[in-house]
Amino acid sequence: MANEFRGTDRYIATEELMAAVNAAVVLSRPLLIKGEPGTGKTLLANEIARALDKPFFEWHIKSTTKAQQGLYEYDAVSRLRDSQLGDARVKDIRNYILKGNLWEAFDSDVQPVLLIDEIDKADIEFPNDLLRELDRMEFYVYETRETVRAKHRPVIVITSNNEKELPDAFLRRCFFHYIRFPDTATMTQIVDVHFPELKRELLHEALTTFFKIRETPGLKKKPTTSELLDWIKLLVAEEIPPEVLRSDDAKKLIPPLYGALLKNEQDVHLFEQLVFLNRRNAR
């Protein structure tokens, strides 16, 4: 298939993820991406655009975001103010129509990639309010009495953190993929992209420690890929040797610069207790 997505030089994609992206493109369906925080959901859309050489548009959703904002907004307040000031711009209502992210993507002269990020942050009706526009690739502007149609159907990537369940009618129109947290082999590839000259011994010890922390039972917040990369950056900057990460020193229950990985005191104490018990039982 021409123009297949195969990942990029800075985004390691699994075979499953590549297949999902390419399937969504073939079907002309939005690609709904779920997964743990830090698994590259948001970055994916940008990398698809880079790989396929397409323009990129992004719409980051907040709890207050309404579907209409993605289409357009009519600035009635500015028009009223300009009318009172005798501004000639008021004669053309188009001067007060603010294009949204969907409109900008629909206007693209070549097929774009559109990211709708964290759709589950909005209210429960938000996905349903976009059904018609995403299905038909058009919407009506009441103020100007015109229909805006997409010049090219965008490649749409929608991310969700599972904060809310999405409506069935919306899900039926999507191709779904869950990004699993990277295993050691995939994580090694990811780290290599960011730190190509990292010594193998330090990489091995860092990954061993990282996954040991993630596997700690009862951990409130597991460290993510981005936090691992931050930690490795600090290890390199501080010239921390690999042997420090595997030290059996009873006074060093947690790894150096742990603040990049453990983000609350409960998790710090929990990990300290687990390491202490494991070392005591090993004697």
Cite the ranges covered by each PLM segment:
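C-terminal regulatory/interaction module of P-loop NTP-utilizing enzymes
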Residues: 1-283
